Design a protein with these regions (language model features):
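Conserved GNAT acetyl-CoA-binding A-motif
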Residues: 102, 109-121, 263-273
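A short, internal acetyl-CoA/4′-phosphopantetheine-binding micro-motif in the GNAT/acyltransferase core
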Residues: 83-93, 239-248
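Conserved acetyl-CoA pyrophosphate-binding loop and the N-cap/start of the following alpha-helix
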Residues: 92-101, 249-253
Length: 410
């Protein structure tokens, strides 16, 4: 019987599996703890699925990493697990090992009272069949720096004595907290970042560290950019991986900052949430290439516990919900959700299994709960079945759509 357990010692094996899975074009470089065990690489918990429980079995069939995080959902912070580095060597593929690894991972999350699992998929179809589904869109805008000159024109009258751009280092990460908190309150699934995450995942990069510049107004950070400059002389791109602005003026200042690189770069690439109005404020939106892609995927770990911990609008409701979960037996069944005074109670029941008010899969329920998909959208796309329109109306009241954005990569 397969054994799921931590990988405390076989870090060279984890390194080999991960290198082959995600960067095969570079070969598999020899494991060097000084190079491959930097602080960024040691965050999270490594796990492996082994053929046996034998202690001398040093060759897992597949591996993964769990990041123990917290994310904001409907105004409250909930324990969230980032699932990453899922890798299987060719000789063990298509034997059901990853399915077992995912099932064991969810069981471990449940033991730790984790409410949501988030991952960045190599293929959406693959993880969708196991119950994860898209949590948000990611919008990438690309243009020549000159296209952003409108922002410089708009900010020319700003008080130079009260505004300044300042380059920050990892030791300055606390200066960004207030601006990031504004961002976190705006978007569902935004992470609660501790100092270690700021240092090693925001200020620290895989092969090189990004630049981090803050826009300060009256001695307070009103916005910031995390970016790299890629390419060779004459073909450089300023690539922004994180853009946070507390208000419209701060957004214009950040765009103007990018425009001011027109002597250094030929293109500017901005990665941002879908509601950041870059095309709306641009003077020449037709000169901006905009691409919308699916972001990470989210999954509820335990339906009954999660429904009981969420905050709801101040209303009363009683719904029977049938959930299909291909991976966990504790979620595959019927639940009664009772809401009163903004709090809910979700209990697993059997009496309503044949006559629920609502029927949907765990992936669709996850999207509904975090706010990415509305009940009406899920019904319209065949992802949710309801006995009548009142059930849809109740779900719409309990789970109104919200802006969601989980931009942290791992």
């Amino acid at each position: 019987m397969a054994d799921y357990r931590p990988i405390p010692d076989e870090r060279d094996v984890f390194h080999d599996y991960r290198s082959y899975a995600f960067r095969p074009e570079l070969g598999v470089p020899a494991y060097d703890p000084d190079e491959h065990e930097e602080p960024r690489d040691t965050l999270g918990s490594r796990r492996g699925l082994y053929a046996t429980e034998a202690a001398d079995d040093a060759n897992p069939r597949c591996v993964c990493r769990h990041y123990w995080l917290e994310a904001r959902v409907r105004g409250d912070t909930h324990r969230t697990a980032g699932l990453a580095s899922v890798a299987t060597p060719p000789e063990y593929r298509r034997q059901g090992h990853v399915r077992q690894l995912l099932a064991h991972s969810l069981a471990e999350y449940r033991e730790h009272d984790v409410r949501f699992s988030v991952l960045w998929p190599f293929q959406y179809r693959f993880y969708r069949k196991y119950g994860w589904d898209t949590s948000n869109r990611v919008v990438t805008h690309e243009c020549e720096p000159s296209v952003l000159s409108f922002a410089t024109d708009a900010t020319d009258g700003a008080d130079a004595d009260s505004t300044i751009f300042r380059r920050l280092e990892a030791d300055d990460c606390d200066r960004l907290e207030s601006a990031y908190e504004t961002h976190r309150e705006r978007y569902g699934l935004a992470l609660e970042r501790d100092e270690s995450w700021w240092r090693h995942r925001v200020f620290g990069g895989h092969d090189r560290d990004p630049f981090v510049y803050a826009y300060e107004r009256d001695d307070r950070v009103a916005g910031y950019l995390v970016y790299t400059i890629d390419g060779e002389m004459g073909d450089r791109t300023l690539s922004v991986s994180e853009l946070v602005a507390t208000d419209h003026d701060a957004l214009l200042a950040l765009l103007s900052f990018c425009h001011d690189h027109d002597s250094q770069v030929q293109r500017v690439r901005l990665r941002a949430p879908a509601d950041v109005p870059i095309r709306d404020v641009a003077r020449d939106p037709d000169e901006i290439d905009t691409e919308v892609t699916d972001g990470p995927m989210v999954r509820i770990v335990d339906v009954a516990e999660t429904l009981s911990e969420l905050s709801y609008p101040d209303c009363e409701a009683d719904l029977a919900i049938a959930v299909e979960d291909p991976l966990t037996d504790w979620n595959d069944g019927a639940f009664r959700l009772e809401v009163a005074n903004g709090r809910g109670e979700g209990d697993s029941v059997t009496a309503v299994a044949d006559d629920p008010d609502v029927r949907l899969g765990i992936g669709a329920l996850s999207q509904l709960v975090v706010g990415f998909r509305s009940a009406r959208t899920l019904e319209r796309t065949g992802r949710l079945e309801a006995t009548d329109s009142s059930a849809i109306a109740t779900l719409s009241t309990l789970f109104p759509g919200t802006e969601t954005y989980h931009g942290d990569r791992y």
